[in-house]
């Protein structure tokens, strides 16, 4: 019987669960509150704090039980921009109402519902609206942007070094995915970001192995 560590990041709580491969029964669970940091450049999630929690929890599970695989799930409506230095830009809180200030302008850029199946939602619930607002608010982001990954795959990137996007995350009212063509929607072309997105992978694919240095630490 093998052990699977599940990283489960919700908006209000971050959770690590160790489950067995037979029946997926929980063996151990660790949680900590997740909160929005209300400071410049905009309200954002504490990615660094969550990463410390993840590393400590994985190390504890590995020491007590052993880990054979890691799976990641997160809340939706979030995206991570990675700079040329390999570090993440602050990840915008998708409930930030200031995004609505550019709603009319964004409406001219977003792909039609018939292409994406995404309704036009308030605040940053459409990831495309988040991207438009951030790039308009801070144009310098484009100069330093290296790649964009979906939120679950950000944690996979920290674990493995591999950058990827997942079409199930993109397909969740993001305005960025055309499920009929199984390709990015024209919203990304309007935003000039198609080339920035990490390659799309299936959610059941193995992203990679944990980086050797990190594996030794854990």
Show the residue positions of the predicted features.
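Short, charged, surface-exposed secondary-structure boundary motifs
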Residues: 38-41, 100-106, 176-178, 210-211
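A charged helix-plus-loop insertion that forms the helical arch/lid used to bind
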Residues: 85-99, 171-173
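Residues that line or immediately flank small-molecule/substrate-binding pockets and catalytic motifs
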Residues: 74, 95, 204
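Short alpha-helix plus adjacent loop in nuclease-associated cores
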Residues: 95-114
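N-terminal glycine/serine-rich phosphate-binding loop of ATP-dependent small-molecule kinases
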Residues: 1-91, 116, 144, 194-199, ...
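Gly/Ser/Thr-rich active-site cleft segment
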Residues: 9-11, 115-218
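Generic alpha-helical structural signal
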Residues: 51-55, 59, 100, 104, ...
């Amino acid at each position: 019987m093998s052990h699977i560590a599940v990283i489960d990041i919700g908006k209000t709580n971050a959770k690590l669960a160790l489950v067995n491969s037979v029946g997926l029964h929980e063996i151990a669970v660790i949680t900590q509150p997740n909160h929005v940091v209300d400071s410049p450049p905009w309200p954002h999630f504490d990615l660094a704090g969550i990463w410390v929690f993840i590393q400590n929890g994985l190390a504890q599970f590995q020491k007590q039980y052993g880990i054979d695989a890691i799976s990641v799930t997160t809340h939706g409506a979030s995206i991570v921009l990675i700079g040329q230095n390999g570090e993440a830009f602050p990840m915008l809180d998708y409930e930030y109402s200031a995004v609505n200030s550019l709603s009319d302008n964004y409406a001219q850029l977003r792909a039609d519902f018939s292409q994406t199946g995404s309704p036009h939602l308030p605040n940053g619930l459409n990831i495309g609206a988040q991207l438009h607002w951030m790039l308009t608010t801070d144009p310098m982001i484009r100069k330093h942007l290296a790649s964009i990954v979906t939120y679950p795959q950000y944690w996979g990137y920290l674990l493995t070094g591999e950058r990827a996007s997942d079409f199930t995350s993109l397909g969740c009212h993001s305005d960025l995915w055309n499920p009929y063509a199984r390709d990015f929607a024209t919203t990304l072309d309007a935003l000039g970001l198609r080339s920035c997105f990490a390659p799309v992978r299936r959610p059941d694919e193995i992203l990679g192995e944990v980086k050797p240095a990190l594996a030794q630490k854990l």
